[in-house]
């Protein structure tokens, strides 16, 4: 392995966090390929090919040739979330080119949820749950003393490519315009000054007349923006995971109303939902934040850093390639090289903060075991006494019923006497005589 190299098939790898987040720790020396891939001869010292480019003919053709020879392992990197329109409604994307199937030996997925979807496309045994190394340094504390109590800062963001044709762009523009119109009518919301922070792409900011007149490359880093806001609205994008990872209440902004591979606790799919959703983002219910956190752990492997898993996966693939070439056999791989993250996801079952989920229920506010034991003992004692008390009350009720029966009989007798007297004097009785008891016991 000492003489082998890892070849990255991406011209801009040295400036992309998809690669720079782990390249310096690579178990093999890294070489970035900037040649035209269909004409690129695979070097003899290639220990592994790594790329996230899996869309165009150039990459797919080069990957297929190497994959068919089955001597040099290919690792495909997932660079973010799956987006429904990008998969199925992208007019410039060749049908089936998005991992249907994967043209490689393994795909480094960002989470279990993504792995399940891609495996359903005919990729059994190819998906490894790695995570996103570039997010390893994101703080998950959710605490920021710099945030103001009288100001609500809401980030409105779009994906780098929010639309794939003119019709989709029109819908995206409609959605962000609806947010702007709503904010203009609500400068103060829920007793707090509303401040929108815009992070739009595809020329939407100047078209709306929002944001700063700054070139995209000169913008404040997204990580710093996320650290300064209270909540996030975003079109389908990996921004969602970056936001949720920071424990920010986060909603999808999707007027396309497309299926979502990642479920969100909040979604705005029409303008009449803005007020109610933003109201909850400003004061998020605990149960929705718990659901948001649950989805995060399913969609992003983040219980432990992703970089060590990626490096382990690279080493495992390189070893398998070496063994195949030494023995003149095809590369053979287990269905899972990495098992830790999936096992961790299955084992996770941390207790919930029941008091936070039900803030209005004072019963759950008491977490003193001794006090709870005393109250439970008293409750058990009280329950033991109840059958005797109920028996006494039943006796008293039976006595009252007998007294009521006697009173009813006296009233009936008096009524019949009055009727008889009226008849005797020729006066038509107001009511006929009562025959028997008008009321009967339930028994």
Feature roles, as predicted:
Residues 7-138:
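Active-site and donor-binding regions of nucleotide-sugar-utilizing enzymes
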Residues 19, 135-207:
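Conserved catalytic-core segment of nucleotide-activated headgroup transferases in glycan assembly
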Residues 19-20, 41-43, 117-121, 205-212, ...:
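Short loop/helix-cap segments at secondary-structure boundaries that form the rim of catalytic
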Residues 238-302:
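Catalytic binding pocket for nucleotide-activated donors in carbohydrate/polymer assembly enzymes
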Residues 283-391, 395-405, 409:
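C-terminal amphipathic helix plus adjacent low-complexity
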Residues 388-443:
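Helical coiled-coil/dimerization "stalks"
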